[in-house]
């Protein structure tokens, strides 16, 4: 069946009270953006607590569904038939046509669920359920009614128009992008950070990203891998700016002047400082990392506290309590896993100490960083001046 309309269901937005319209408008904007490059003409509208997407002429159904299923704020996409006439007899004809078109095999149980928002329509919801159920049974005797656990729930909404639907394609949930500020993601080539970006974007935060590149120790292919990961995240987050920092000279200075068991912590602290500078320049309110407690030596509570002390912006760690397998499952779900496991080194995996400190003391780390005085500031400025910015979109 070629559907001409979708009903868009949303979750948390519906309980936003007086600000609900702002979230609805933000969601509609994201829907329009998602469908912008899809073949066909789409009209997005809202009416009485419902958001609709109506198609004018031919369109790419599969592509439209794929794009909508990645829009944060949507919990369900219901392909539907819209009937402009509110003639009761016409409704009976249309509901039979709908069942026949959508379900070629009729050996299933069903239930009709009517919502009569327009109280001028004759009858009650219960009486309409019964009459439409009878009409369907007369047309298709092999079908059976089951009001407790039907195989198919046929929904009829009587509003300005009459909507008929029975299929709900799940969306990602969450909040529309841009309704909760913006933040800077420290993006590496691993499994965790793309998932962290996805998780924060799901809460309505507009995400930017920074990647620390260390040529010749990291290859151009490693850089390309991170760009690919950013593109995959942007399928959900929308277009994002990816800032690329050349971190080589800073890493070499740290390696040359600081204790080797503190290399990872000190490098992470300077990454945080640079990420914060870029975030502030771009008006972001927080930093995002993919760390979780205890996963590696640099992710003990003491290490995370020491890393946080390098920045003044809040640091969001949406994966903090996740097991690795849980993170892997999300990465597989959002399509980043296969790219993340490609064997290209990033700057977090070179110059790694054999026995890194796991319980760093901030005062000791700051004392070690004093050995970089007269060197590091100039290198930081050079890194900022030579940074690259790419607008990434799926």
Mark where each language-model region is.
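A short alpha-helix-loop-beta-strand transition element characteristic
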Residues: 335-343
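Conserved G/P- and acidic residue-centered "switch" motifs that form tight phosphate/ATP-binding loops
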Residues: 190
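Small/polar glycine-rich anion-binding or flexible loop at a beta-alpha turn
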Residues: 295, 343-351
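Active-site adenylate/phosphate-handling loop in enzymes that bind or generate adenylated species
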Residues: 134-136, 173-180, 251-252, 256-329, ...
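RNA-binding accessory domains that recognize and position tRNA/RNA substrates
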Residues: 1-184, 194-241, 309, 357-362, ...
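A conserved beta-strand->alpha-helix junction
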Residues: 230-256, 346-347
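Structural beta-sheet core signal
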Residues: 185, 209-211, 244, 289, ...
């Amino acid at each position: 069946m070629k559907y001409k309309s979708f009903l868009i269901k949303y979750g948390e937005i519906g309980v936003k009270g007086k600000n609900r319209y702002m979230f609805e408008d933000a969601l509609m904007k994201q829907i329009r953006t998602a469908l912008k490059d899809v073949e066909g003409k789409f009209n997005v509208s809202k009416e009485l607590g419902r958001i609709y997407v109506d198609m004018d002429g031919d369109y790419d159904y599969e592509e439209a569904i794929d794009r909508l299923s990645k829009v944060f704020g949507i919990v369900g996409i219901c392909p539907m038939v819209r009937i402009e006439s509110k003639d009761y007899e016409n409704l009976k004809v249309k509901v039979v046509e709908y069942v026949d078109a959508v379900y070629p095999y009729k050996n299933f149980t069903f239930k009709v669920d009517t919502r009569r928002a327009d109280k001028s329509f004759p009858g009650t919801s219960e009486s309409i359920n019964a009459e439409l159920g009878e009409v369907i049974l007369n047309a298709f005797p092999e079908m059976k009614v089951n009001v407790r656990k039907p195989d198919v729930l046929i929904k009829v909404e009587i509003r300005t128009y009459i909507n008929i639907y029975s299929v709900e394609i799940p969306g990602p949930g969450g909040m529309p992008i841009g309704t909760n500020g913006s933040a800077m993601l420290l993006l590496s080539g691993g499994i965790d950070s793309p998932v962290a970006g996805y998780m924060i974007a799901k809460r309505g935060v507009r995400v930017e990203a920074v990647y620390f590149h260390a040529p010749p120790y990291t290859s151009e292919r490693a850089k390309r891998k991170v760009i690919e990961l950013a593109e995959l995240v942007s399928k959900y987050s929308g277009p994002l700016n990816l800032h690329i920092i050349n971190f080589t000279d800073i890493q070499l200075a740290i390696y040359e002047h600081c204790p080797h068991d503190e290399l990872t912590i000190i490098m992470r602290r300077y990454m945080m400082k640079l990420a914060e500078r870029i975030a502030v320049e771009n008006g972001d309110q927080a930093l995002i990392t993919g760390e979780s407690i205890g996963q590696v030596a640099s992710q003990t509570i003491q290490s995370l506290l020491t890393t946080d002390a390098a920045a003044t912006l809040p640091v969001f760690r949406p994966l903090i309590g996740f097991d690795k397998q849980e993170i892997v499952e999300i990465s597989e779900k959002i399509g980043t896993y296969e790219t993340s496991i490609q064997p290209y080194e990033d700057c977090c995996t070179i110059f790694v100490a054999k026995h890194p400190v796991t319980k760093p003391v901030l005062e000791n780390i700051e004392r070690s960083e004093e050995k970089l005085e007269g060197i590091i500031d100039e290198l930081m400025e050079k890194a900022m001046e030579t940074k690259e910015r790419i607008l990434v979109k799926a």
